[in-house]
Amino acid sequence: IKLGAEKVLGVDIDSESIVNSRENAETNEVGEELILGVGSVAEILVGKFPFKSAPLVVANILAPVIVRLFDGGLADLIEDGGSIILSGILQEQKKSVLEAAQAKHLTMTEWRQRGDWVALTMSR
């Protein structure tokens, strides 16, 4: 939001994560612009939340979960011409995430590593 996003949707399956996100948003004075809710990729796609896709999607989840989410529609959240930033990936799991993303016609545009952890940016 502070970098110019008009709307932001934060979704997690864990209600405590949503509580923490709300507190962080209020601390950073962006609470009113942020939509938060408990849900899943499938629930986003069927319209439980105000929008079903975005130009930028961010997921900070362990690699095996990211791979499963690609099978559950994660790539469908990305608007045409958009990107997804994936983090929470161990270096040795990078290949499996790349393969899952490429199977959904995403292309890696950037990656970064810090210690054993990797973050990938994929584009549609």
Regions found by a protein language model. Give the residues of each.
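Conserved SAM/SAH cofactor-binding pocket of Class I
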Residues: 1-40
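A short acidic, Gly/Pro-enriched loop at the edge of an enzyme's catalytic core
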Residues: 42-56
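Active-site capping/gating segments
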Residues: 89-124
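Short alpha-helix immediately C-terminal to the canonical SAM-binding loop
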Residues: 18-19, 66, 94
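Residue-level signal for inorganic ion chemistry
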Residues: 21, 62, 101
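A short glycine-rich, Lys/Arg-flanked "PGG" loop and its adjoining helix->strand segment in the class I
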Residues: 70-83
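Conserved SAM/SAH-binding loop
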Residues: 37-46, 117
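A short SAM/SAH-binding and catalytic strip from SAM-dependent methyltransferases
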Residues: 55-68, 88
